[in-house]
């Protein structure tokens, strides 16, 4: 499993004084939405298999999930939203355990690309609080 971590989030959170949890949620939702929507879709299985868990990676796979691109994205995002809402102060793991996800990541860099854009997401979240 490849692990990407967001760096320097604490420096940005200091700017919002008391609104840290809102910034963390907004950034996590935006980045999660980015890589879910960047995941290639043939039958929706890979895009529909994103999961969010607190403090440990998810281990489940929904092999039979099939849906349109937008249905698959909504399916994954709805599963991730609850954990993201409770993530402040905890480790948040967004995982996809479908066996070919690393191959898709090597082709498209959907997670890596979203993580590289995290500064933009943090800036937007901080601006949204003012």
Describe the predicted segments one by one.
Residues 1, 5-8, 69, 110, ...:
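Non-membrane alpha-helical secondary structure
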Residues 6-7, 11-100:
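Short, low-complexity, charged/polar segments at coil/turn and helix-coil boundaries
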Residues 102-104:
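Short helix/loop capping segments that flank catalytic or ligand/cofactor-binding pockets
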Residues 107-130:
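Protruding loop/beta-arch "assembly-hinge" segments enriched in small, turn-prone residues
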């Amino acid at each position: 499993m490849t692990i990407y971590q967001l760096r320097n989030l604490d420096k940005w959170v200091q700017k919002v004084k008391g609104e840290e949890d809102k910034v963390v949620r907004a950034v996590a939702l935006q980045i999660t939405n980015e890589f879910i929507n960047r995941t290639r879709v043939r039958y929706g299985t890979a895009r529909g298999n994103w999961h969010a868990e607190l403090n440990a990676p998810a281990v489940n796979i929904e092999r039979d999930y099939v849906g349109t691109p937008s249905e698959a994205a909504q399916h994954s995002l709805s599963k991730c939203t609850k954990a993201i809402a409770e993530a402040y102060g905890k480790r948040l793991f967004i995982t996809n355990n479908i066996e070919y996800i690393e191959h898709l990541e090597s082709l498209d860099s959907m997670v890596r690309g979203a993580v590289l854009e995290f500064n933009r997401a943090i800036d937007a979240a901080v601006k949204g609080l003012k």
